[in-house]
Amino acid sequence: MDIDPYKEFGATVELLSFLPSDFFPSVRDLLDTASALYREALESPEHCSPHHTALRQAILCWGELMTLATWVGNNLEDPASRDLVVNYVNTNMGLKIRQLLWFRISYLTFGRETVLEYLVSFGVWIRTPPAYRPPNAPILSTLPETTVVRRRDRGRSPRRRTPSPRRRRSQSPRRRRSQSRESQC
């Protein structure tokens, strides 16, 4: 069975695969971040959102995987086999959990549009030959400040991604990030 844990949220495994494995913080850092930002919602018996549920499940899966790894480490007597299991868990399962945790936390923190736009921007940047791309990769936290997306209204053009050169950009900070943090659920 080929299950894509990102599909219902508008992303895909392929879209996240453009981010290199060293891009994702450690599981411990991601767990600390999730706890600091969303502890109340994660521990609540109430259903908050599909992302909170998915984040809970990823955290629980990591805990179970660590329990299994500890059991294997304590009960597998052959050191070579033990090392193979530990390396497999850290390399493959660890990366998948880090990707899941990063995606869920980013989605809750920055919102769907910003995260998806970041994934597409990074994918385009990384596939562009170095001689033709800017030296620095896109940064997720700066996307809301550097892009302009307008809602579709009657009589307006569908989307404008960058301000026209004639218009000065407002110096007031954008509030998209703080709005997503206000409602924990």
Swiss-Prot record:
Q: Where is this region: RNA binding?
A: 179-185
Name of the encoding gene: C
Known role = Self assembles to form an icosahedral capsid. Most capsids appear to be large particles with an icosahedral symmetry of T=4 and consist of 240 copies of capsid protein, though a fraction forms smaller T=3 particles consisting of 180 capsid proteins. Entering capsids are transported along microtubules to the nucleus. Phosphorylation of the capsid is thought to induce exposure of nuclear localization signal in the C-terminal portion of the capsid protein that allows binding to the nuclear pore complex via the importin (karyopherin-) alpha and beta.
Any single GO BP term: viral penetration into host nucleus
Q: What's this protein's family per the entry?
A: Belongs to the orthohepadnavirus core antigen family.
> What Gene3D superfamilies does the record point to?
Viral capsid, core domain supefamily, Hepatitis B virus (1.10.4090.10)
* Motif Bipartite nuclear localization signal: chain residues: 160-177
| sequence repeat ranges, renumbered to this chain | 157-163, 164-171, 172-179
Q: How is it modified after translation?
A: Phosphorylated by host SRPK1, SRPK2, and maybe protein kinase C or GAPDH. Phosphorylation is critical for pregenomic RNA packaging. Protein kinase C phosphorylation is stimulated by HBx protein and may play a role in transport of the viral genome to the nucleus at the late step during the viral replication cycle.
Chain positions covered by the region annotation Disordered: 136-185
- Cell compartments where the protein resides: Virion; Host cytoplasm
Q: What UniProt keywords are attached to this protein's entry? A: Capsid protein, Cytoplasmic inwards viral transport, DNA-binding, Host cytoplasm, Host-virus interaction, Microtubular inwards viral transport, Phosphoprotein, Repeat, RNA-binding, T=4 icosahedral capsid protein, Viral penetration into host nucleus, Virion, Virus entry into host cell
Q: Which organism is it from?
A: Hepatitis B virus genotype A2 subtype adw2 (isolate Germany/991/1990)
Which portions of the sequence form the region 3 X 8 AA repeats of S-P-R-R-R-[PR]-S-Q? Answer: 157-179
Modification Phosphoserine, positions: 157, 164, 172
Pfam families per UniProt? Hepatitis_core (PF00906)
What is a single cellular component term in the Gene Ontology annotation? host cell cytoplasm
Keyword RNA-binding attributed:
yes
Classify the source by domain of life. Answer: Viruses
- Which molecular function terms from Gene Ontology are attached? DNA binding; RNA binding; structural molecule activity
Q: What is known about its subunit structure? A: Homodimerizes, then multimerizes. Interacts with cytosol exposed regions of viral L glycoprotein present in the reticulum-to-Golgi compartment. Interacts with human FLNB. Phosphorylated form interacts with host importin alpha; this interaction depends on the exposure of the NLS, which itself depends upon genome maturation and/or phosphorylation of the capsid protein. Interacts with host NUP153.
Basic residues: bias regions:
149-178
**Has keyword RNA-binding?**
yes
Task: Report what the protein is called.
Answer: Capsid protein
